[in-house]
Amino acid sequence: MHDKWTSPELDSLLGSRTLTRRKVLVTSLATGFALAVQPVGAQTITTDSDGLTAGEVKIPVADGEIPAYRAMPAKGGNFPIVLVVQEIFGVHEHIKDVCRRFAKQGYCAIAPELYARQGDVSKISDWKQIFAEVVSKVPDAQVMSDLDAAAAWAVKSSNGDQRRLAVTGFCWGGRITWLYAAHNTHLKAGVAWYGRLKGQATELQPKYPFDVVADIDAPVLGLYGGQDQGIPLDDVEAMRAALKAADKSSEIVVFPEAGHAFFADYRPSFRAEDAAAGWAACLAWFRQHGVVA
């Protein structure tokens, strides 16, 4: 059950570098995920909340409520909305920082805790336990519903503009980004960071992005690493060909020297130049497709 998940996510944590003290701290994520909620090392980007309204909120969902992190400009209104979809490690400090980066660009950014019902991954010390007890038990249908609820809440409670809705996600959230673009017909655009494109279907997670190409309405920009050991380039090229054959306006960019999680500045897989280029491409994609002026 675990094999289909472990390669890209865990390999990107461990890497193959010589272990300095900082790198030992980074790789300890494999046995203690509490570290993922705090900045690690000089490469970690920290975005302040000056001029922002930022913090934890509660989102009403179909069966109650779930926690989320929300960041938006402190002044103004009618903000474009971006749903920020977590990595497998939940809504930790890196994901919150990404929300603040978007807020500095004028967005209302929301990262809902999509594992809230299944467990708190920051308190689980073993990665196999995370996959077995949490990730594998999160239904795609529930995730789609929660993202819809987060978007609706942003409109109602955070001055969000329902006509300018975007989504972006990383790793586990990259796959979700593609699926959400096939789910929500009101979505303006999406950016999927190294989300798995093909995989073994399960009852709770029945489809992968390659399976839903025909249903993708919103333009999605896929950002992938040419050295990703968990997402074969053959899969990336197959997805690109399928999008073209279906006459979709989505695009895929491959960074030749990057591996999995090249945007994650708290992990040894981080590549500053590719991360910066990917971020610029993400913002430009949203501008191009009318999320922001």
Identify the function of each model-found stretch.
Residues 1-19:
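N-terminal secretory signal peptides
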Residues 249-293:
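C-terminal catalytic histidine-bearing segment of alpha/beta-hydrolase fold enzymes
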Residues 125-166, 291:
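Gly/Ser-rich "nucleophile elbow"/oxyanion-hole loop immediately N-terminal to the catalytic nucleophile
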Residues 18-26, 32-47:
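N-terminal twin-arginine translocation
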Residues 222-224:
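Short beta-strand/loop motif that positions the catalytic acidic residue
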Residues 150-209:
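Primarily recognizes the serine-hydrolase "nucleophile elbow" in alpha/beta-hydrolase
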Residues 43-74:
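N-terminal cap/lid segment of alpha/beta-hydrolase-fold proteins
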